[in-house]
Amino acid sequence: MKINFINLGCPKNLVDSENIMGFFKKENISSYHRADTVVINTCGFIEQAKRESIEEILKAIGDGKKVFVTGCLVYRYKEELQKEIPEAVFFENIKDLEGIELLQTPKRQLTTKHYAYLKIAEGCNRKCSFCAIPNIRGHHRSKSIEELVEEAIYLKEKGVKELIIVSQDTLYYQEDNSFKSIIKLLDALEKLDFPWIRLMYLYPNSISKDFIDYIDNSKSVLPYFDIPLQHISDNILKSMRRGYTKKDVFRLLEQINAMKHKKPILRSSFIVGYPTEEERDFEELLDFISQELFHFVGVFEYSHEEGTYAYQFDDKIPKEEKQRRYKEVFNLSQEILEEKNSALVGQEIDILIEKKDRARAFFQAPEIDGIVFLEKSSPKTGIIKKAKVIANIGTDLLVDI
């Protein structure tokens, strides 16, 4: 049997895929074209992701593959999928599969070389009106510090230089929400001497002054704040059930920017076209983003998802209008990023060389924040070096090492 794995969706899904791969012998893992069997780990978070997942399943079936499907789409629509696509096998636990030889002592197979994600929890206890994740993944469940340290040691032995901590609500680790438990975990991980530790998905309400101070004084935790605000209008934030106000956001950003030892890098993401979003709310969001408080901005069109609190609202904003608002925010975010990158020209930055001709700066998370091109090829990869920025190429950078 030759088996290929297709991962769709977020970094948390990638960790799941890598763990599933660990149940198979390396020699059985193959490219898509050589494989007779395909395992697809789906995303079912929003409409676009659901369409992509279905398309991948049907393509693999059409290509004559034996298809096994798992992930959020299966957790959410397993019965419907089994009825509509009987050619595929849909599963929630790899150990439930019959007729496939699995290793008894699985070891996670990394698909990335110099960085890896450490998923510290599953599920979410938040009640955001637009989000289906609690329905799909269940309530928040944390892994123990001991289990995570053991996994991190394994990743370190595999040559990982950057450890990226992820979950649906990272600072809610061990259902503490007062930052103390996540600090205990970070203390334990710092002892392993990863050069870079990055945290993703920081819920605004959970970012305390003490946590900010910890980042400011940490030797390896990067001053990278990924804070998905979703909106800035108080009307929309209240309807979204986010639990904070515009004033709270500005107070938080002021605290972060008051760091004494490090210069913070901020990323956020926003939803446009939410059912109750009026033009004035959208203009308020544009004005907020235009203040250039964030280095990186992600934007998504609202997806009307059954089972969510917001599903009771009339999804009245036309698709064309959602697309217009999306394009305005996206274009603005790209302009801001180009300006911020231009300001880096002539400065020295720390980079992780991932390939002979490219790298990432400490302020760039994989896949979403752009890349760094090397003017001259590096003979070594997997090393962190100082580099001088000599140009910005759109939203990317060119450096001399």
UniProtKB/Swiss-Prot annotation:
Subcellular location as annotated: Cytoplasm
Cofactor binding, per record: Binds 2 [4Fe-4S] clusters. One cluster is coordinated with 3 cysteines and an exchangeable S-adenosyl-L-methionine.
The MTTase N-terminal domain, residue ranges: 1-108
Cofactor list: [4Fe-4S] cluster
Binding sites annotated in the UniProt record for [4Fe-4S] cluster 2: C124, C128, C131
One of the Pfam families matching this protein, by short name: UPF0004
The organism's place on the tree of life at top rank: Bacteria
Recorded catalytic activity of this chain's protein: L-aspartate(89)-[ribosomal protein uS12]-hydrogen + (sulfur carrier)-SH + AH2 + 2 S-adenosyl-L-methionine = 3-methylsulfanyl-L-aspartate(89)-[ribosomal protein uS12]-hydrogen + (sulfur carrier)-H + 5'-deoxyadenosine + L-methionine + A + S-adenosyl-L-homocysteine + 2 H(+)
Keyword vocabulary terms for this entry: 4Fe-4S, Cytoplasm, Iron, Iron-sulfur, Metal-binding, S-adenosyl-L-methionine, Transferase
Domain Radical SAM core: 110-339
GO biological process: tRNA modification
Enzyme type, top EC level: transferase
Family named by the database record: Belongs to the methylthiotransferase family. RimO subfamily.
Protein's job: Catalyzes the methylthiolation of an aspartic acid residue of ribosomal protein uS12.
Protein name: Ribosomal protein uS12 methylthiotransferase RimO
